[in-house]
Swiss-Prot record:
Entry's Gene Ontology BP terms: DNA-templated transcription
Source organism, top-level taxon: Eukaryota
UniProt subcellular location: Plastid, Chloroplast
Keyword hit for Transcription: yes
Protein name: DNA-directed RNA polymerase subunit beta
Primary location recorded for the protein, binned into one broad class: plastid
Length: 1070
């Protein structure tokens, strides 16, 4: 139980703190622990000994900056140097040198690592904690069978089972079960020691017969029996030292390694006092586990809940990096051992520099960050996405679960999750419940458990202390919920309050309360904490909102929300998109790309991000927010980033919405918008695409970047400079050349037809020795070139080619087909853009900006959007911003309604507009049809809502083709927008054509215009020379494909012609 220093006060910890603490723990402890495990290495003759002196290792500051690493596609890492010594045992001479072990990727201020120029982040994994767990299952006869499962540190399982006759069996890796006395004897205990150290010796002596007693009468017999069962070998193995070593290596060192966490859990569960440094399974553990299992059979003890968080552990970034570092050192050990033996064999004098190479460590970390499932590319769609990504927790990954095998019970919410893992924020689809998000106050403890803070309540004292509790501790306390979440400490507590105790929710007297929650948002993640009035929403819609806020596109002109929750400031601050003053000073001058200020006697220049592309093609940009000559304080915002205004998160826009049907254009989650959102650039966003080309050295020669491209129109090359690269500021259309490149090819005259060679000889045309492989702008990529980067190769190696990257910016207004969403799970697709004069308008003449379907509210139970809409209207008229904590119903009933209506009433009084608050239908107003000027029949809910534009945009999804590529084997059109793919006319489309009786059109769709190869060619020739298009005689390729697939299933499909005269069957070949 840990106490915080500030009594009675709590601040929200940094959202990136978990990543920072994990990496610091790896640097401070993990590196040293693994280096101390590095053994002394000797040659085969034991004449030379190599060892590392790990006490004085050094990590060197990186030579490049973060921006340069991203720009040049390098890894932002630190070099690790360790003193090493080589000792000649015969002469007692020692040669000591500081050797370079390798590069360790560092963590930047965002909690991420830069590997090969890409921001990557390591997410936390939730695993079953090592130890022993008891459970009960019913067999086929309906009788309870008790088992104890021992889980090792790496995830291996061994089971103890007690049957109906009270016999205890052991099972390793789901193999055949053996008597518990066999592994106990094989681990070094004789029968007398076993009987002296158990509570139920009569049960251990009851079931072995004389034949079985011989198996564990001695340690050798027990080892042979255990090896025969464990290794599944036939015959009678012979006892030997090699057999003991193999068993020791394969079983006792791998499957019986508990680790420090497993040793602690085993001691607590079985009431043992084995030292913490003994991390392997001992015979004493096995006997105590069997004793406890017998007690379970007799009704003593409690079963374990495998889904309780006290039985889980977090595998953080520190553990993963330490595991990889240990793996790299094992590889380095093998390299050093092989190099020493090779040097002695060739009679060379080795040195520590010659023995150690940096390849194992560097390649291990590169493969880890590039291939490991828990190492992911940082999602940088908007600032919220960056900080949420690092707080994810996953049950998936090596040693964990899979999306197809995880049960519903594992995915479900558990009472121990409260205050630790958000019960709302999870992914949708097959991974639902398996990928969660940590609560905002949660932290990872020393033993890998998720801890949550509480206020400790004293009966005789009014002082309050904050304590952090692990899941195994807080279930023994009465934890108050409900009104104990009150922000105001002076509120008089009621006599009876709701509380949580031992995974149950009770209502008890206030005097019995031990702990209380510290914050209303304590149970939620960052995404869920940004939803106002979340208590009025269905949890499924809150889940959708948490995910959709991470998909919001940064707009060209951001606007902070009128109705918020108060966490917007810290979310923007911890995201790192804003520039914060590190100390006091005075601004000397500001430019669009840098801020220069003086402080502490130094002049500091801070570079700003200028139109930087994120990995989701959104635009990251920083704008100075301070003026020349102004004095600044430490912590003040110097420049705002994308989707931030005034240091607060600003993902969307406050626009005027109405909930009403409009000619069916907003049915089924469709949304009707005004053209003001288009022409006023309300939802305009910038997107930056990257196009890349590399030059290689081929077998015919090197590829060339040039402007002189033969056989191409000059119009396509108009934007290239003299080097053949597109110029900055050029406007590029689809099909234009971005980089001109020629690839050499061999010219063989024999490959041409005789008439071609004759024509070339007459006209004097030279055979081309190059082919054009230019970088062309694909469909949908039109825009303005904002940056060109030519990364030159170093050292002239053909394996490190030159790379040219072209960045093109697109300005996208909102259009039909784009996806918009609110913060309450209310999402929709733009169906129509109306002129502003046709939109419904209010009584003061203002036209509505967006029209939602009112039927989408009651069935989905996300009523929070109605409160936000009405309160946003009042805030817009009163020029106020509201920051509302959730669960305000704890103060009184209808608290949210009592908050909104007085604000509407005040806005109505101050603006002299009685329609803002009408007592007959509060929150609603009569609005008018913009086309006719007539009022609608019923009053309509309207107000200001905060609406986001999501990254699912029609420009990235719409696709069509008239002709394109076909698969070579199946002759079917390719699939996907990236391959310029298409679709066949399907079954339902054929039904539609049949319904209209258009037989010829239907035949064309299935033959000429589809995959009938010969018919397609005949149509082309007939169209050129004229004539009648003949009907196809044979089947199209799709029918042939069906026959081939049936043949692959051993089904032969033939067709026959039956004669009408004699009914003889004449077979015709297909």
């Amino acid at each position: 139980m840990l106490r915080d220093g500030n009594e009675g006060m709590s601040t929200i910890p940094g959202f990136n703190q978990i990543q920072f603490e994990g990496f610091c723990r790896f640097i401070d402890q993990g590196l040293t622990e693994e280096l101390h495990k590095f053994p002394k290495i000797e040659d085969t003759d034991q004449e030379i000994e190599f060892q590392l002196f790990v006490e004085t290792y050094q990590l060197v500051e990186p030579l490049i900056k973060e921006r340069d690493a991203v720009y040049e596609s390098l890894t932002y890492s630190s070099e690790l140097y360790v003193p090493a010594g080589l000792i000649w045992k015969t002469s007692r001479d020692m040669q000591e040198q500081t050797v370079f072990i390798g590069n360790i990727p560092l963590m930047n201020s965002l909690g991420t690592s830069i590997v090969n120029g890409i921001y990557r982040i390591v997410i936390n994994q939730i695993l079953q904690s090592p130890g022993i767990y008891y459970r009960s299952e019913l067999d086929h006869n309906g009788i309870s069978v008790y088992t104890g499962t021992i889980i090792s540190d790496w995830g291996g399982r061994s089971e103890l089972e007690i049957d109906r006759k009270a016999r205890i069996w052991a099972r390793v890796s789901r193999k055949q079960k053996i008597s518990i006395l066999v592994p106990s004897s094989a681990m070094g205990s004789n029968l007398r020691e076993i009987l002296d150290n158990v509570c139920y010796p009569e049960i251990f002596l009851s079931f072995p017969n004389d034949k079985e007693k011989k198996k564990f009468g001695s340690k050798e017999n027990a080892i042979l029996e255990f090896y025969q069962q464990f290794a599944c070998v036939g015959g009678d193995p012979i006892f030997s030292e090699s057999l003991c070593k193999e068993l020791q290596k394969k079983f006792f060192q791998q499957r019986c390694e508990l680790g420090r966490i497993g040793r602690r859990n085993m001691n607590r569960r079985l009431n043992l006092d084995i030292p913490q440094n003994n991390i392997f399974l001992l015979p004493r553990d096995v006997l105590a586990a069997a004793d406890h299992l017998i007690g379970m059979k007799f009704g003593m003890g409690t079963l374990d809940d495998m889904n309780h968080l006290k039985n889980k552990r977090i595998r953080s970034v520190a553990d993963l990096l330490q595991d990889q570092f240990g793996l790299a050192l094992v590889r380095l050990e093998n390299v050093v051992r092989g190099t020493i033996c090779g040097a002695i064999r060739h009679k060379l004098i080795p040195t520590p520099h010659n023995l150690v190479t940096s390849t194992p460590l560097t390649t291990t970390y590169e493969s880890f960050f590039g291939l490991h499932p828990l190492s992911q590319v940082l999602d940088r769609t908007n600032p919220l996405t960056q900080i949420v990504h690092g707080r994810k927790s996953s049950y998936l990954g090596p040693g964990g679960l899979t999306g197809r095998t995880a049960s519903f019970r594992i995915r479900d919410i558990h009472p121990s999750h409260y205050g630790r893992i958000c019960p709302i924020d999870t992914s949708e689809g097959i991974n639902v419940g398996l990928i969660g998000s940590l609560a905002i106050h949660a932290r990872i403890g020393h033993w890998g458990s998720i801890e949550s803070p509480f206020y400790e309540i004293y009966e005789r004292s009014k002082e309050v202390q904050m304590v952090y509790l692990s899941p195994s501790r807080d279930e023994y306390y009465m934890v108050a919920a409900g009104n104990s979440l009150a922000l105001n400490q002076g509120i008089q507590e009621e006599q009876v309050v709701p509380a949580r105790y031992r995974q149950e929710f009770l209502t008890i007297a206030w005097e019995q309360i031990h702990l209380r929650s510290i914050f209303p948002f304590q149970y939620f993640s960052i995404g869920a904490s940004l939803i106002p009035f979340i208590e009025h929403n269905d949890a499924n819609r809150a889940l959708m909102s948490s995910n959709m806020q991470r998909q919001a596109v940064p707009l060209s002109r951001s606007e902070k929300c009128i109705v918020g929750t108060g966490l917007e400031h810290q979310a923007a601050l911890d995201s790192g998109v804003s520039v914060i003053a590190e100390h006091e000073g005075k601004i000397i001058y500001t430019e669009t790309n840098k801020i220069v200020f003086s402080g502490n006697g130094d002049t500091i220049s801070i570079p700003l991000v200028m139109y930087q592309r994120s990995n989701k093609n959104t635009c990251m940009h920083q704008n100075p927010q301070v003026q020349r000559g102004k004095c600044i304080k430490k912590g003040q915002i110097l420049a705002g980033g994308a989707s931030t205004v005034g240091g607060e998160l600003a993902l969307g826009k406050n626009i005027l919405v109405a909930y009403m049907p409009w000619e069916g254009y907003n049915s089924e989650d469709a949304v009707l918008i005004s053209e003001r959102l288009v022409y006023g650039d309300i939802y305009t966003s910038f997107h930056i695409r990257k196009y890349e080309i590399k030059t290689h050295v081929t077998s015919q020669g090197p590829e060339r970047i040039t402007k002189e491209i033969p056989h191409l129109e000059a119009n396509l090359l108009r934007n290239l400079d003299k080097n053949g690269i597109v110029m900055l500021g050029s406007w590029i259309e689809t099909g234009d050349i971005l980089v001109g490149k020629l690839t050499p090819q061999t010219a063989k005259e024999s490959s041409y037809a005789p008439e071609d060679r004759l024509l070339r000889a007459i006209l004097g045309i030279q055979v081309s020795t190059t082919r054009e492989t230019c970088l062309k702008l694909p469909i949908g990529g039109r825009g303005r070139v904002i940056d060109v980067r030519w990364i030159q190769k170093k050292g002239g190696s053909s394996y490190n080619p030159e790379t040219i990257r072209v960045y093109i910016s697109q300005k996208r207004e909102i259009k039909v087909g784009d996806k918009v969403a609110g913060r309450h799970g209310n999402k929709g697709i733009i169906s129509k853009i109306l002129p502003r004069q046709d939109m419904p308008y209010l009584q003061d003449g203002r036209p509505v900006d967006m029209v939602f379907n009112p039927l989408g509210v009651p069935s989905r139970m996300n009523v929070g959007q109605i409160f936000e809409c009405s309160l946003g209207l009042a805030g817009d008229l009163l020029d106020r911003h509201y920051r509302i904590a959730p669960f305000d119903e704890r103060y009184e009933q209808e608290a949210s309604r009592k908050l909104v209506f007085p604000e509407l009433y005040e806005a109505s009084k101050q603006t002299a507009n009685p329609w803002v608050f009408e007592p007959e239908y509060p929150g609603k107003s009569r609005i008018f049809d913009g086309r006719t000027g007539d009022p609608f029949e019923q009053p309509v809910i309207m107000g200001k809502s905060y609406i986001l534009k999501l990254i699912h945009q029609v420009d990235d999804k719409i696709h069509g083709r008239s002709s394109g590529h076909y698969a070579l084997v199946t002759q079917q059109p390719l699939r996907g927008r990236a391959k310029q793919g298409g679709q066949r006319v399907g079954e339902m489309e054929v039904w539609a054509l049949e319904g209209f009786g258009v037989a010829h059109i239907s035949q064309e769709m299935l033959t000429y215009k589809s995959d009938h190869i010969r018919a397609r060619q005949e149509v082309l020739g007939t169209t050129i020379i004229g004539g009648t298009i003949l009907n196809p005689e044979d089947a199209p390729e799709s029918f042939r494909l069906l026959i081939r697939e049936l043949r692959s299933l051993a089904l032969e499909l033939n067709h026959f012609l039956v004669s009408e005269k004699n009914f003889q069957i004449n077979r015709k070949e297909a």
